[in-house]
Amino acid sequence: MKKKKSLIFAVSIALAFGLTACSESESTDVESASCEKADLATIAEGKLTIATGEPAYYPWVIDDKPESGEGFEGAVAYAVANQLGFSNDEVVWVRTTFDGAVTPGEKNFDFNLQQFSITEERKAAVDFSSPYYTAPQAIVSYKSSKIAGKTSIAELKDAKLGAAVGTTSLDAIENQIGAKPQVFNDNAAGVTALKNGQIDGLVVDLPTAFYLSGVEVTDGLIVGQLPSTGAGDQFGLLLAKDSKITTCVSGAVDAITADGTLAAITDKWLATDAGAPVLKP
C-alpha cells in the first residue's frame, strides 16, 4: 500500500447510556424514539448510509476505499456504526462534495465525514456530532533539514521554526516548544521560507501538515506532532439539520471516546502508520 500523502489533515464524556433525551415526548418529532438500532430513523431501513469525499484521501481513507475501514475516518465510521448496532455489512457508502454536504437541505446520507470543522456558521445549516478529532500542531520540514529525525521537543529548542500570525501554531512554538518563532503573514509565506532554507520547520495543524509535506514541499516530511492541548479545530460527523439521529450518533462518538477505541484509532492512523509520531518532551 503506497502511502501517498495528498490534499486535503478529549473532552468530558457523556456516556451513550445517559442520552435519554431522545425519548422525551417533546422531542419525538425531531429525534428517534431511542438509540436502539431498530428505532433509528436512518435513510434506508436497517442500513446506515455514510458519506465521504470523491476522492477520499490518505490518511483519512486508504486507497480511496472507505469500505475497507482503513484510514482514520474509515475506521471511525465503522466504529460509530458498530456502536449504533450496525454490522460492517449494513453500512452503505456514498460520495458527496465538501461544499454540497455543508449546504442546507435534504441529504442522501445519515452522516458524512470529510474533516468537517465544527463552526457556529455551519451549525446554522447542518448538525454535528460530538467531536471525534481535535487537530494537534505538527512540524513540517524536509529530508535534509537539520531537524529531520528529531524525536523530542527538547531537540527543537534551537531550531528556526515559523508559523502564520495569529494562529494556534504560533502559540505552540512559544508555549510548547519554548522557542522564538519567525512569524509569517500566512502559511504560503512560511512554505516559501522553508523551501528557501530560511527556517528549519513550519508549524501548522496536522491535517495541513499532511498536505504540505506530501504536495508543496519537495522531499517533505512531518518531523512530528506536538502533544495535544485540546486547542485547535475540532472535527465532527455532519448530519442534516435537525436529523432524528444526531443525539444517538453523538452518543456513539462519546462511547468510543470513553472506552479508548477512538484513541487507538487515532494513534494507528494519524501517528504510528502515518509517519507523524507524537514528539516526546
Regions found by a protein language model. Name each.
Residues F17-A21:
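C-terminal motif of bacterial Sec signal peptides marking the signal peptidase cleavage site
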Residues S23, G74, N82-Q83, Q234-T272:
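Extended ligand-binding regions for polar small-molecule ligands
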Residues D29, A38, E90, S169-Q182, ...:
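Ligand-binding clefts/hinges and TM-proximal coupling segments of bilobed small-molecule sensing domains
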Residues E31-N112:
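Extracytoplasmic small-molecule ligand-binding "clamshell" domains
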Residues I50, G69-Q83, F116-S117, A135-V191, ...:
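Bilobed "Venus flytrap"/periplasmic-binding protein-like clamshell domains
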Residues E54, T134-S141, F210, G214-G251, ...:
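Periplasmic-binding protein-like
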Residues E90-I153:
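Acidic, polar ligand-binding/catalytic clefts
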Residues G100, F116-A125, D200-A231:
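A ligand-binding cleft/hinge motif common to bilobed small-molecule-binding domains
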